[in-house]
Amino acid sequence: MSNPPVFTTSQGCPVSDPFTTQRIPLDSTGYKYAPPIGPLLLQDFKLIDTLSHFDRERIPERVVHAKGAGAYGVFEVTDDITDVCSAKFLDTVGKKTRIFTRFSTVGGEKGSADTARDPRGFATKFYTEDGNLDLVYNNTPIFFIRDPIKFPHFIHTQKRNPATNLKDPNMFWDYLTANDESLHQVMYLFSNRGTPASYRTMNGYSGHTYKWYNSKGEWVYVQVHFIANQGVHNLLDEEAGRLAGEDPDHSTRDLWEAIEKGDYPSWECYIQTMTLEQSKKLPFSVFDLTKVWPHKDFPLRHFGRFTLNENPKNYYAETEQIAFSPSHTVPGMEPSNDPVLQSRLFSYPDTHRHRLGPNYHQIPVNCPLKSGSFNPINRDGPMCVDGNLGGTPNYANAYNCPIQYAVSPKASGNKPDEKYTGEVVPYHWEHTDYDYFQPKMFWKVLGRTPGEQESLVKNVANHVSAADEFIQDRVYEYFSKAEPIIGDLIRKKVQELKRKASSPSKI
């Protein structure tokens, strides 16, 4: 057995007692008992070293997805999809790639409850031979917005009122009812699917449309689905509320304990594909994040499985400091023109640079350890700890440091790329009747399972009953655009709650 480590200062100086401080005794004359000890000394490096580091322990929490849990695992290719994608990590059935997945809530702070009614983040980093690939998904196949500039507005309404610092139902519903494209996601959120029973028992969806291309340069639009082998299980509103009080870290604990005892969660991986010509025949834009692709027209195709089988050794170093971005991609995959996705390509690395520093890619959990990295331009900056490429010239030079470059992917084959014409215009997505069609279909899907429609009505009513009456009226109208009966049922439920609140309680 090796000797235990020696306690030291940050500079490696051995410490005999971690709790002593340097002080000057007072003159003990006249003191009946032990005299008080005098002032501290600024020269006490051990004390200053300890306190100054403690003062800087916290970094900014994520502006969204602050509360999360993660684990390492392995992805395995189960089916050949090289006709669709030329990414090397997908080129052979049976091939395995190390991954890290982080689950999270969206709107809450780091100390908030895991069971809050909120979408769940579902982000996975693949450590591939062509660099790191990040698939930054949610547990819902759609989202609240499709105009990216609305994102800060939307998120502010889901957080705290700037005056009261309280969650504000008026803010929450004021924004949503003024932006009808949110209806599909809001119905999903206020169904029981808005409160997953655990991170292990929920699916993951790309939501966005991506473009994948094969070795010939032929490309298709793609949506990705992760389907939980544990099944999908949700909480009723009452259960979620109870757990928020009794065990606010319920989902974090559930994931950790399952992996610790060898009950490894896994997900099957599927894609939907669509050609450019097929996209032109859709009743909605292929780049609309508030819509799903009908499975009967675009069936699921299996391509892999991933299993989470290793808990992090240190939450801060790994789960907290891991940095995901949809711009972290590999050859064979690229973003589409989905405007919300395009905005995330900038925003995610930008917030990492703010939160973790410009060299966040050097943090071990973010390093492309399998492929390595070499870019003589990216040098220096705060916390550059990788050797800074030594004396290598800091430009692409052919003089004394020849560099190899990757082979460019082949140009498109028989499938043409999108064509862009016209002038730059200010664009704001306009609502159409189809914006209410998929919410209407979702209401019918809920009707296939007893109690699901009733849960949606009750969950909305419980939330909006705290809002002002004119906001409530807007909520009834909002849901009625999907199906008039939904607005009527919510109105009746809110009125019932008001009567109960106003009636004298019996002792």
Swiss-Prot record:
Active site, per annotation: 65, 138
Cofactor: heme
PROSITE patterns: CATALASE_1, CATALASE_2, CATALASE_3
Gene Ontology biological process terms, A to Z: hydrogen peroxide catabolic process; response to hydrogen peroxide
Domain of life the protein comes from: Eukaryota
TM spans (from-to): none
Single annotated GO MF: heme binding
Keyword Magnesium found: no
Catalytic activity: 2 H2O2 = O2 + 2 H2O
Enzyme class, spelled out: oxidoreductase
Entry keywords, A to Z: Heme, Hydrogen peroxide, Iron, Metal-binding, Oxidoreductase, Peroxidase, Peroxisome
SMART domains listed in its UniProt record: Catalase
EC number(s) reported in the record: 1.11.1.6
InterPro entries: Catalase (IPR018028), Catalase_AS (IPR024708), Catalase_clade1/3 (IPR024711), Catalase_core (IPR011614), Catalase_haem_BS (IPR002226), Catalase_immune_responsive (IPR010582), Catalase_sf (IPR020835)
UniProt-annotated location(s): Peroxisome matrix
Amino-acid positions noted as binding heme in the UniProt annotation, renumbered to this chain: 348
Motif range (Microbody targeting signal): 505-507
GO cellular component: mitochondrion; peroxisomal matrix
Keyword Heme: yes
Family statement: Belongs to the catalase family.
Subunit architecture: Homotetramer.
Function statement: Catalyzes the degradation of hydrogen peroxide (H(2)O(2)) generated by peroxisomal oxidases to water and oxygen, thereby protecting cells from the toxic effects of hydrogen peroxide.
Name recorded for this polypeptide: Peroxisomal catalase
Organism: Pichia angusta (Yeast)
Lineage of origin: Eukaryota, Fungi, Dikarya, Ascomycota, Saccharomycotina
